[in-house]
Amino acid sequence: HNRIDFEDVLLGMLGMLEAEKRVLDQVRAQYSVFVVDEYQDVSPVQQKLLEMWVGPREDIVVVGDASQTIYTFAGASSSYLLDFPNRYPGAHVIKLETNYRSGEHIVTAANHVMAGRPGALTLVSSNRDATPLRRHVALDDAAEARYVAGTAAELIASGVSPDDIAVLMRFGAQSLLLENALRDQGVSHRVQGAAAFFDEPHVKRAVMEIRGAAVAGVQGELLPVVQDILFGLGLGAEAPEHQGAERARYEDLVALQELAAQAAPGVTLLEFSTMLQRRMETGDNPSVGAVTLSTVHAAKGQEWPVVFMIGLAEGQFPISYAKTEDAIDEERRLFYVGITRARERLFLSYAQKNREGQQPREPSRFLRALGEGAEKP
């Protein structure tokens, strides 16, 4: 279909460097030092390409964490990271064992999970004043969703920003019950990877109206002008009482209003409308304060002060089709990535039965590795 993906680009580049010495020499002459981040996630093709770029030199720096190798299904292998000192005997190895993100209890849990695994470090937290982990056992999936939603609502009521809360899960379908429970509690949320903000019809219309006003030469301070346009499209002074499409529409219009409020002094309506169109094209989505729902894979590289990890039962995490030792180890690393997304508070939960209440479940082996202390239903 005359289309190529990222892997095709890598293969094409590798083939060109192998076939065209002139191009290879130019690349090696152009770049003197190579720095590779997330080195535990490189694939064989990427490793071969890196070796072609570097050549016989040793001017290379790699950064990685073998405990965060969670893309083996895409060809990633931590072996390149672990074997690096053997391939470069003169390499200076710096172990980054101080964790500046997570509290002491979270780091201790992470160490328990990865103890004895290849390349695992024994981390030390720089934050000694940390809240203990909270573990909860729910009767069924619906009860687990209600627990998470209720606890999130309590945290928000106590002053925690919704943007500082994330709920992480092994697979996306686990969010369905949770979304309903959050709506029942009146808690705004965003599903990471869901439909883009600027794809919403009411947002497209609002951007079009703002652009039209700018082209027509409407004068005045930016925020009042934008507010007038948004009020004309249904933005009220008060949020709708109930969750649903009307509330979602209101929050999207508020997000546009917030963009106008955050604009630098002196920004014109035309400049603002141009910025909106640029963000629409690039998919840079604003949002009002909302709890993030995400799979652990999608959450990698991010962090939140408060993290809930749900579905921590055998067959869910580790997932049911993880049968081999290597597959279980990948699930273990994924669990490690999940718990280390939390900075201050970490909530771990599972349900004893499924939604229909028919299939009993056992707690995840990863949860059991952390010891006792779960709250009972």
Where are these regions (language model features)?
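Helicase P-loop NTPase motor core
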Residues: 89-92, 97-187, 212-213, 245-250, ...
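Short glycine-/polar-rich loops that comprise or flank the Walker A/P-loop
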Residues: 56-59, 65-67, 88-92, 129-133, ...
